[in-house]
Amino acid sequence: MQPIQLFELASRQAEWLSARQEIVAGNIANADTPKYRAKDVTPFNAVLDQTHIGMARTHAGHIRDMSSRQNVDVVDAKLDQEIGIQESGNTVGLAEELSKSGEIKRQYELNTQLIKSFHRMMLMTVKK
């Protein structure tokens, strides 16, 4: 039997969500700073690719190998056409950053709910 990697995967995602929330909070804090450039982190898929955590392939037709490796970095956020560069010269859009913050919250809640459910299933299995 192969080890269950769900807990490690969830832990990695929680770390990534924490880092992203920190960057988004920094963007919000600097919304009025002249010439401040909004930042974001690389997508979680890139982080997942780097950690070499994946699902076990038990049959050749089940999972395709996605071998794109990227660095996890803080990068300048893409300019939204609506926001663009403001008079102060910065690229922070409060509505967009608050939306990102809400998305991070939902992803974190989903992450913790999945772990709780999986933990309950494991406990039920052990008790029987």
Per-segment meaning from a language model:
Residues 1-128:
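Amphipathic alpha-helical polymerization modules
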